Amino acid sequence: MDFIDNQAEESDASSGHSDDEEPQSKKMKMAKEKSKRKKKMVASSDEDEDDDDDEEENRKEMQGFIADDDDEEEDAKSEKSEKSRHSGEDELDDEDLDLINENYDIRETKKQNRVQLGDSSDEDEPIRRPNHEDDDLLSERGSDDGDRRKDRGRGDRGGYGSESERSEDDFIEDDGDAPRRHRKRHRGDENLPEGAEDDARDVFGVEDFNLDEFYDDDDGEDGLEDEEEEIIEDDGEGGEIKIRRKKDTTKKSTLLESIEPSEIDRGFLLPGDKKIAKEDLPERFQLRRTPVTEADDDELESEALWIIKYAFEEGTVTNQADLDQDDKLDCIMNLDPSVYEDRKKAVIKSIKKVLQFIRVRSNSFEPTFIGFYRKEDIDNLLTMNNLWRVYDFDEKWCHLSEKKNKIYDLMRRMREYQELSDDLTAKRRPISDADLMDTKYAETLEQLTDIHANFQLLYGALLDDMIRWEKGRLTGEEEEQEYRVKFKSSIRNDKYQMCVENGIGELAGRFGLTAKQFSENLNWKKHDIEQDPMLPLEAAEEYVCPAFSDSDMVLNGAKFMLAKEISRQPQVRHSVRQEFRQSAHFWIKPTKKGRDTIDQTHPLYDKRYIKSKPVRSLTAEEFLFYHKAKEDGLVDVLIMYESEEDQDSNNYLVNKYLSDSIFQKDEYTENVEQWNSVRDECVNMAITEMLVPYMRDELYNTILEEAKTAVAKKCRKEFASRISRSGYLPDFDNNDDDDDGMDQHGARRIMAVCYPTERDEASFGVMVDENGAIVDYLRMVHFTKRTFGGGNNGLRKAESMDLFKKFVQRRKPHAIGLNIEDMECTRLKRDLEEAVADLFSQNLIYKPIPVFLMDNEAAKVYMRSNVSLAENPDHPPTLRQALSLARLLLDPIPEYAHLWNIDEDIFCLSLHPLQRDIDQEQLALVLSHELVNKVNEEGVDINKCAEFPHYTNMLQFTCGLGPRKATDLLKSIKANDNLIESRSKLVVGCKLGPKVFMNCAGFIKIDTIKVSEKTDAYVEVLDGSRVHPETYEWARKMAVDALEVDDSADPTAALQEIMESPDRLRDLDLDAFADELSRQGFGEKKSTLYDISSELSARYKDLRQPFQEPTGELLYDLLARSGKEIREGAKVLGTVQSVQYRKVDKDAADSMLPDVGEDGLFTCPCCKSFTSSAPGGIQEHMLGDSRQGGCPGTPVGIRVRFDNGMTGFCPNKNISSSHVDNPLTRVKINQPYYFKVLKLDKERFSLFLSCKSSDLKEDDLSQRDQYWDEHQYQADLELMKSESKKKTEANTRVKRVIAHPNFHNVSYEAATKMLDEMDWSECIIRPSANKDSGLSVTWKICDRVYHNFFVKESAKDQVFSIGRQLSVGGEDFEDLDELIARFVQPMIQISHEITTHKYFFPNGTCEETEAVEQFVREKKRELGRSPYVFSASYRQPCQFCISYMFDNTERIRHEYFKIVPHGVRFRHQNFDTLDRMMAWFKRHFHEPPIELRRSAIPAPQYRVGAPPAAPYYPPQFVGYH
């Protein structure tokens, strides 16, 4: 609050009031603030990230480690109070506050979406993301947008208008005598960009929109300090006095608070948005997660080398070879080694050139511009995908450099603090030049993570002191000693820091090698071990202190300390990381939920049991399926270094480091042997307990990120396939415009028909012109009905088809598209084709019109979108779907770009099953790259974008532009009569800066023919081509030279003539022209000249692949998408549709004899179904027409139909294991059966099936993973069978009907839970688990011990009722009340008497012998005599043990006794009460039991666990220890 007060005082000090008018305290406060402003503050550049360790982890780690922490707590409280006393004396900047928060473990809680790296207790979490620059960047992405949005309603705003204008209203409303409130009014919209109010009116559709309503009258500066206001009153003598009074602080509601932020964002009204729109820099450069920054030549050289290594050469942990092909450098693949290095140098040079184009501010070119207009500079070595990869990795390089500079600066400052301060603690581990160089030359975030982790361990506790030392040094205040005292105790209450504070580090230094020396010995033995002359425990004795109370604790602390330091050494981490990743394996096992959930349709069905699979064998996105299943609780995932064979041979990771004897002294003395053992424990602790868990989590995150990247790449590839083809281009001829009312020659007319999934809804057709605007539409109610359907369906279908014919005859489309909704589309396509053919046969249309099946997904997304509803509010959904489908057939790019809107409808496209499981920002990045490529390749008609809303979104993907610049540009166009006559007007009229214009000019095309019709101004013909304005003169020169006319000729006329006769360009020597340009200093421009020549031949020729209707496998995938996926080996439910027959030749039929059945009837030998009493009837049947009841032929199988409309064939041999002549003897028509898919033929849309029980039971073993865990699978199978059997038995057991308060139909487990909540005197009677003619009685003896016995029933009237006679042992009872009163309650009473006895052992059972004996000894020390102790038996309920010392040797004897309904049985004697048993025991305890007299061999004691199977020891068994 002091900081806020100080700022408020500054504001007030500049408000124009004199010092005399201020209160005295206020003047003193301002003077003090001015003094503080004179001091120089040092900015801490420490990491602005949260510290990963938390206090809870440290407390757990500290448990049992130190002797007493009371003093430490008191110190901590003292520190806290000391800190609060000085909190207002120093003003820290944000980074200093972040740094202190980091080291005090004060941080905001973040939602963790990733596996946390659990090794470190003091590393910063974001920087520890291993090998995931992508993910790290995602987490760092500028919160630019978010911050700008947060700034929407806040921030100080300057004055608005003059002072006199502001006081005008006060003057008018003044009533003379009333006090005047003379308060400055700060308008909330003072700093709003010009035109923001108009934009807001457009967005919200409110003509009288007033931005004043968005902001409070009183801004933050207005009285922030003391919340006062000035009131001017008459002093009675003609003068005025000013009175300061507390102002009304009641917060006023604003219009801003009632509007969703997203609604304001739609218009890009924020100041930050306007700044992006106006700045002369590509918008994507400004919005990049790490913005593009200026770089010098040395940095670009280093970056180019780094990019070729990590972007194009560095491999992945998992197998991503197939997906990485698009990003590989084709120019150096499969080259001969003799030329490889030279080509690689050329590629590095090209990459550096690309970086110069991106990062040198005088260029600022986007990758697309470089690919099209700077081909020669990159020697045509880099593809467009390569350029984008360079751009993306430039972002990672900038992010890495930013992190690196922060850590380097922090280490440099710490070293300065070590060298110049008087803090001896800081000098213990000086930072060397090598440490700084390691940081400076770190190449990956992993390396930086390791360096930072080591720094945080060694110097993290010194950061507070360093900051205060820096401030004290620069301000000249002598407060350093005070700071040192105040921060003497560590604020980091973790195990390592406790060791440091108590001097344990000195003992760790006597182990022979420091952690740094150990890491340097990994490659070769550079350092010899310095052997300490004392034994380890003897040396530890010297460091015993209150916190470490004995030598064992000291030695353990030293081992932990050195192990921690070893685990943080970057070289050690690098070594372990490489080893771990090379050999890591993983195991997959389904959970109980997974076993029930994962069926044959699940992608992990054949991968759900995995054993010891190498991580490197994972492919593409495979691991993301495992991760998703793990998150859903379906499987358990375990990653380990050792394979199953390694575990069997004890070949663990740590052994690789121990076997090299890095930390071993080669001597055989007792001292050396003990020290070697201690050193091995250190290494084992560092590797096994600290690094392996860390590396396991790090590897998990790494392969998870690789899987997510694979999904993103597959989404990009799928999306590219949808926009890489052009729309339908008809072959125009002279008959195309022979009808009145048709558009001009060459204009396309596209029709689309969409039918709904609900058959009772109407279908719609729509026709669009070449601009995608609706020309006409058609409603067909009965389009989906069948032509030969029953009832009136045929007539209704004909009505709809007649409407379709009339529409086509009138509008004459060039092509018709039909949506692929389900399998019905193939039938409906035939209907449309027949209708078109009928029109053509009647000469009603001049040529056949093609009908195409089309992917319907994008059209359905558009149909459901808010944009669709806003643009076509009066059209039904199916018509809107047809409109989108027609535009997709016209040109897919504008329609897909149309989905990239504020609602992000583009993400509704189904591109990959796992696309929802990756970060949407990552998905947006790869999809935007593809749209930028294709939009710029096709070119953007800017006037069409201004005229038609469905084209508008294309403009944002133009090179150099973005959503903000595109919006701003369109507003400028609308202000200029909605027309751009030339590219030059983008600069003159729309005020585009030179850099943005250079990027976008070549990709913005002007339809010169249409523009010429609308304006009399000069229209540059080259503006309609891909020729960039910077090379217009070369194009004109080429046209003049090709025509061989004088240079003084009109170049525009020459261009026109060349475009009409492009063949004349063939004779032009472009190579010579290129050489001339090179001599004139323009550089190599041969590729550019050839591109210009191509454009003059055909302006903006579509470079995409021509439109192609989906067929074969692609069509099958689109059709199968409408239902449940069917794959080979799957079991699917299908309905028998018909029997399939094979025709029999008539000549062969004459020679076939009918079969004679047992009933004497004759049966057809072919169809096996027709019978007749005479052979002639069979002959007539065989020769008859099958459509009129004749023989259909020999049945060969059945035709099956599935829910998704597909059909399959199951031959006779696959219907049953036995021979089948007639399928109808095994199956019935229209009945559902399960079938197994043996073969899937996507080209023919056919399935080859089997319904044999043997096939249905077997899994397709060929589909199983190579590392399938058969042993675990069989074990789980047996477990599932056992559980199923128990469940079946439970369901079949008769439910008992017994009216008694103690009876419950529950299991033993449920009964024990109920008894835990009941009184000790209660018991539960329940059905017996083994027999229906029996009951079980259960009661609780003590914690974990329950007695249970069987009651036999006889004389039962019903199986579910209770028997009239109950028997336990040899005793009979008439009913349950008698059983409880005579048998159960006496034993409960005696057991309660024992368990409440003062000498009863309550903390365990008698099987826990050591605990019982310890309790006996404690009682002896407490009572001063030999006691006896009771304990209950866990193994044998209803039996107890009495433990006692029977002689002076303090040996303890344990004897069992048993409670019975009539008392207690002990040493083969019965006693009525416990007191009588104890009286007898006290007289005879010194006598050995009978069993010990017979045998001197002590008996074994029971332990808590499973009940013993054999032998059975009698209740009176005794033994002693």
Swiss-Prot record:
Segments for region (Disordered): 1-238
Source domain of life: Eukaryota
Compartment(s): Nucleus
InterPro entries associated with the record: HHH_9, NA-bd_OB-fold, RNaseH-like_sf, RuvA_2-like, S1_domain, SH2, SH2_dom_sf, Spt6_acidic_N_dom
A GO biological-process term: transcription elongation-coupled chromatin remodeling
Motif (Nuclear localization signal): 26-42
Basic residues bias locations: 26-41
Positions with biased composition (Acidic residues): 45-56, 67-76, 90-99, 166-176, 191-200, 209-238
The S1 motif domain, residue ranges: 1183-1252
Domain SH2 residues, every copy: 1300-1389
Sequence ranges of Basic and acidic residues compositional bias: 77-89, 126-157
Annotated tissue distribution: Abundant in embryos, and less abundant in larvae.
Gene3D superfamilies: Nucleic acid-binding proteins, RuvA domain 2-like, SH2 domain, Spt6, Death-like domain, Spt6, helix-hairpin-helix domain, Tex N-terminal region-like, YqgF/RNase H-like domain
Entry keywords, A to Z: Nucleus, Transcription
GO MF terms held by the record: DNA binding; histone binding; nucleosome binding
A GO cellular component annotation in the UniProt record: transcription elongation factor complex
SMART domains: S1 (SM00316), SH2 (SM00252), YqgFc (SM00732)
Function comment: Histone H3-H4 chaperone that plays a role in maintenance of chromatin structure during RNA polymerase II transcription elongation. Required for several aspects of morphogenesis of C.elegans, including regulation of division in the germline and gut and specification of ventral-uterine precursor cell fate.
Family (UniProt): Belongs to the SPT6 family.
Assembly description: Interacts with glp-1 and lin-12.
Protein name from the UniProt record: Suppressor of Ty 6 homolog
Organism of provenance: Caenorhabditis elegans
Gene, per the UniProt record: emb-5
